[in-house]
Amino acid sequence: MDEYEDSQSPAPSYQYPKETLRKRQNSVQNSGGSVSSRFSRKSFKLDYRLEEDVTKSKKGKDGRFVNPWPTWKNISIPNVLRWLIMEKNHSGVPGSKEELDKELPVLKPYFVSDPEDAGVREAGLRVTWLGHATLMVEMDELIFLTDPMFSSRASPSQYMGPKRFRRPPCTISELPTIDAVLISHNHYDHLDYGSVLALNERFGSELRWFVPLGLLDWMQKCGCENVIELDWWEENCVPGHDKVTFVFTPSQHWCKRTLLDDNKVLWGSWSVLGPWSRFFFAGDTGYCPAFEEIGKRFGPFDLAAIPIGAYEPRWFMKYQHADPEDAVRIHIDLQTKRSVAIHWGTFALANEHYLEPPVKLNEALERYGLSCEDFFILKHGESRYLNTDDRAFEET
């Protein structure tokens, strides 16, 4: 993708309750064309104890969001400098395209050649890894993306900052029709300005954006009209597909895009609950008690997308980035039948060797008595289909 500039200013069948709309004061009324809004619909009816045990989002005295668990430690400037200056970087990404093609091949996604084949009806779920935390998920007659990142750099500028060493498997113009996009948080490797502009240019107001609390204004300044902003445990749906519920669920991370906007935007994960399939997207996260809460409330999931990379050194990264063993613990807490690895093999964002995450994942799976089919790795551009009737996987 060409250069972009970010201005910065700018299971069973369920019975759902009636919807309650809460608009921000600066939101445009639906009749005026924009459907961007704060929207909340109370989640499924739960027993009282579980409802009380759910962790809600919290703000500090300065009005900024905070992580509410003892598993979190705030990131300090001295520790950032210690990491950048004192720690050795072992990422070892080769400069040779031939070697990268051998170790991390980029496949042409099936839908580039056969766009009419995209979409899964009734029982079944298909996931395609497009690099880093970007997935195309097809389930319950919907197609949606997670944290779309198609640019060359995860940075405010396409001239500097972390550069991807594996190209996107496809362009935005080669995607099939996308119904929705899920955004987990506002870091540059997960909320990419150029990708947002390109997706909005192609799909316009037909594309529904699900974003965390605090991100609505930024999305509107990008020209996106169909934006739904949610707090933890709030839910919404795509118009015409009200049997599939998108719930914004917790994670342990942080947000920042400019010098002074630390944690003014919430971060989180996504639970997508349909009549045939259930999918979970962790986004970017450290290990925390939230995943057990999510598993108890919405599990078992058919498939979870869990990060396994950007984890070294542990003294610094463990609070914000799960390592492969943490990822397996998250897999277990979520009560998910299968998981797919994300957040590795695309950008060198931490100090582990670029090929280490899958190796460490398989070692952790063996320690926990799980197999590589329980928590699997995809090549860039590769798809896997899950029949949610008999749980049998097929590669494409």
From Swiss-Prot:
Binding-site list for deoxycholate: 256, 348
Position of the signal peptide:
none
Under Gene3D superfamilies, the record lists: Ribonuclease Z/Hydroxyacylglutathione hydrolase-like
Which EC class does it fall in? hydrolase
Mark out the compositionally biased spans (Low complexity): 26-38
Q: Which residues form a coiled coil?
A: none
The residues that the entry says bind Zn(2+) 2 are 189-190, 284, 343
Question: Region Disordered: which residues?
Answer: 1-39
Effect of gene knockout: Knockout mice are born at the expected Mendelian rate. White adipose-tissue specific knockdown (effective when differentiation of adipose tissue is complete) causes obesity, adipose tissue inflammation, insulin resistance in the liver and profound changes of gut microbiota composition.
Membrane-spanning segments: none
Q: Which GO terms of the molecular function aspect are on file?
A: bile acid binding; identical protein binding; N-acylphosphatidylethanolamine-specific phospholipase D activity; zinc ion binding
Q: Tell me a GO cellular component.
A: presynaptic membrane
User: Where on this chain does Zn(2+) 1 bind?
Assistant: 185, 187, 253, 284
Q: Which SUPFAM superfamilies match?
A: Metallo-hydrolase/oxidoreductase (SSF56281)
Q: What does this protein do?
A: D-type phospholipase that hydrolyzes N-acyl-phosphatidylethanolamines (NAPEs) to produce bioactive N-acylethanolamines/fatty acid ethanolamides (NAEs/FAEs) and phosphatidic acid. Cleaves the terminal phosphodiester bond of diacyl- and alkenylacyl-NAPEs, primarily playing a role in the generation of long-chain saturated and monounsaturated NAEs in the brain. May control NAPE homeostasis in dopaminergic neuron membranes and regulate neuron survival, partly through RAC1 activation.
Subunit details: Homodimer. Bile acids promote the assembly of inactive monomers into an active dimer and enable catalysis.
Return the similarity comment: Belongs to the NAPE-PLD family.
User: What is the official name of this protein in its record?
Assistant: N-acyl-phosphatidylethanolamine-hydrolyzing phospholipase D
